[in-house]
């Protein structure tokens, strides 16, 4: 079954011989019919073929591997008739080394991916690993080499991201996340830490909010269970001084924390259109002048050095952009209108909007408008490495993952097969970028990005 899944995924990701340009060019040059056709592609195939050569020929190949690298395809054919045997050869030489996106490894889960692809740091090797959950509720930790380190069955699905904290302030990390009824804290061996998981007083539909006010690892965990809101310390104990214990309607997104001008701002949106701006005690810091018809878009904070140069932005359910100032007013002079159900995010200084099959990005490094063919776009993500910016977006309907660089161009070799938004990272800290995405059968792909 596993081999069959791999074959299906290779076909869908166009990682099979029939999709190779070199193979297609070769087939156009040689006879359609032959008694025997022997085909070799790239230098790795040539190395493999030496086992079928006589000693002198095999030795020649092994001694001249570097010189033979530009050979991208080789075919040898034999045709027999009643008296004679005819042979012909085809050799394709490529003087320019091609930049290709390669599938480094794949990992097959027991079921399709349910969670986001979460990157977590291995505190021993400093490399990045993957924490994911499949639809059978199995939680996996996967190494940077594509090996499943452990698998653990949970009772419920994980909500939102899996994050990391340094509970003991010793540079050793634990994974923190929640399900509908519990908050988990798990070490890198998959074991529960301290009194975790803690049972919630009431079920929640939202991921937890994780705050580190002073960047001193004295974490706070905010859980919004409908209209009720509970603040915990990092040991899973309730904070008694938290003031906003109840709202008139449920929170619609996890609360976010920002520091602007040396002051704390906790932002929480309610279902009834109320936007709360709180201090770290849960007391109201700013009263917003009007209610907002919130959509699925979270509140994005465009952060300056002061509150006067900062603002909160969202696109409401009618497609209207709301620019909320930190004095509580809404600046109508800066409002724009978009189509309903426009997805909006402000990330790394860039405004990212997706609607249907159209992607718009505006910012200091990437500026593009790209229309995909009848696509169903997932939210795009921006990444920056070594002063270069990249944007990943996936067409869920077409099962294609795209990667743009800051020249506003699609990177060579893309799109590639993928059903989830690609996550970009240098997994092994070797200067080589990896794009991680997954397929519909539960296969995770690690693509090399040149």
Regions from the PLM with identified roles:
Residues 120, 124-127, 166-174, 212-220, ...:
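Acidic, glycine-anchored loop motifs typical of Ca2+
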Residues 421-450:
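Blade-level signature of beta-propeller repeat domains, shared across WD40, Kelch, NHL, RCC1
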């Amino acid at each position: 079954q596993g081999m069959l899944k791999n074959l299906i995924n290779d076909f869908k990701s166009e990682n099979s011989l029939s999709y190779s340009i070199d193979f297609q060019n070769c087939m156009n040059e040689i006879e359609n019919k032959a008694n025997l056709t022997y085909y070799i592609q790239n230098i790795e195939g040539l190395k493999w073929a030496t086992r079928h050569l006589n000693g002198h020929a095999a030795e020649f190949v092994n001694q001249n591997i570097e010189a033979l690298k530009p050979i991208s395809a080789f075919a040898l054919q034999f045709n027999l008739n009643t008296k004679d045997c005819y042979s012909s050869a085809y050799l394709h030489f490529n003087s320019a080394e091609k930049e290709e996106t390669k599938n480094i490894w794949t990992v097959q889960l027991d079921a399709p991916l349910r969670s986001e692809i979460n990157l977590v740091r291995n505190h021993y090797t400093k490399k990045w690993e993957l924490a994911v959950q499949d639809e059978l509720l199995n939680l996996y930790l996967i190494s940077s080499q594509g090996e499943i380190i452990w698998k653990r069955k949970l009772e419920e699905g994980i909500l939102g991201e899996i994050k990391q904290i340094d509970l003991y302030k010793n540079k050793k990390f634990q994974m923190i996340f929640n399900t509908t009824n519990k908050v988990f804290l798990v070490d890198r061996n998959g074991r529960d830490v301290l009194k975790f998981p803690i049972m919630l007083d009431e079920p929640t539909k939202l991921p937890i909010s994780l705050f580190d006010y002073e960047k001193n690892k004295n974490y706070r965990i905010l859980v919004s269970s409908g209209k009720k809101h509970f603040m915990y310390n990092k040991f899973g104990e309730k904070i008694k001084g938290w003031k906003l214990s109840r709202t008139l309607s449920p929170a619609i997104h996890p609360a976010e924390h920002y520091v602007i001008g040396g002051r704390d701002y906790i932002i929480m949106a309610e279902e009834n259109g109320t936007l709360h701006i709180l201090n770290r005690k849960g007391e109201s810091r700013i009263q917003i002048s009007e209610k907002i018809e919130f959509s699925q878009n979270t509140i994005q904070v465009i952060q300056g050095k002061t509150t006067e140069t900062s603002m909160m932005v969202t696109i409401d359910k009618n497609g209207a952009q709301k620019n909320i100032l930190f004095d509580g007013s809404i600046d109508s002079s800066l409002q724009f209108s978009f189509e309903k159900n426009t997805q909006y995010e402000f990330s790394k200084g860039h405004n990212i909007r997706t609607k249907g099959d159209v992607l718009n990005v505006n910012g200091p490094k990437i500026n593009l408008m790209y229309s995909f063919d009848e696509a169903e776009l997932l939210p795009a993500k921006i990444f920056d490495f070594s002063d270069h910016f990249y944007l990943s977006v996936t067409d869920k309907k077409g099962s294609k993952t795209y990667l743009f660089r800051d020249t506003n161009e699609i990177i060579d070799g893309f799109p590639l097969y993928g059903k989830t938004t690609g996550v970009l990272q240098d997994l092994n800290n070797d200067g080589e970028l990896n794009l991680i995405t997954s397929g519909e059968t539960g296969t995770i792909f690690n693509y090399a990005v040149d």
